[in-house]
């Protein structure tokens, strides 16, 4: 029984973390209809930034925020290459993904793996320390679930705003956005920034769970996240009360 519970716990821990990435890819793939391959580069970007900051003694929660911002900037670059320089969506993602290899190596000072064992992380500092001993062993599950829930709530709230509705429209009907005196290209850049920010945040959380960063960890992440979105939306497409972000998270689990 203990083995089964342990396996189930690990499934949900990984599922919650990758669910954050899946929600980000949902924005770019489903909402924006943009096949964003830069995800394979921004995921390890979040890991490398987090490992570098925690090794230097920075607050682990601050490392998560910085990772999100860095991922968003990478997403902006992908959008600018596509919107302003008229480079195709696939090639824009490939260029940024390739560039991230050099950026990540620069952050880790040339090391492919950057461990930070026995350092402070979001899983062993702050409010986690006051958890009762009986549930302390589930701290990773609890923290990862809370982080996922926060991202999901914020994303759901954003998609209900005027900017969020324009973001949806920019993917489905760019001409409508133009008729509203808005720039669909700018909305595309915003969408890619949000998507890659979530991806880098997921990388940041996973690196703190593993207490190390690996620049090769991004390989296949775009396939995994797309599979999560497709599986979730396909299985629960007829469930009207379920939000798309929830479907993406369930698909990741």
Annotate the PLM regions:
Residues 27, 52, 76, 80-85, ...:
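Membrane-interface helix caps of multi-pass small-molecule transporters
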Residues 31-34, 56-58, 84, 242:
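Helix-loop interface residues and adjacent transmembrane-helix termini in multi-pass membrane transporters
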Residues 153-193:
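Membrane-helix/interface signature in polytopic inner-membrane proteins
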Residues 1-21, 49, 56-62, 133-141, ...:
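Membrane-interfacial amphipathic/re-entrant helices at transmembrane-helix boundaries
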Residues 41, 61-69, 91, 141-146, ...:
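Hydrophobic alpha-helical transmembrane segments
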Residues 89, 93-95, 100-160, 189-190, ...:
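Transmembrane helix-bundle core of multi-pass membrane transporters
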Residues 199, 203-253:
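Transmembrane alpha-helical segments in multi-pass inner-membrane proteins
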Residues 58-98, 148-152, 251-253:
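Alpha-helical transmembrane segments within multi-pass membrane transporters and channels
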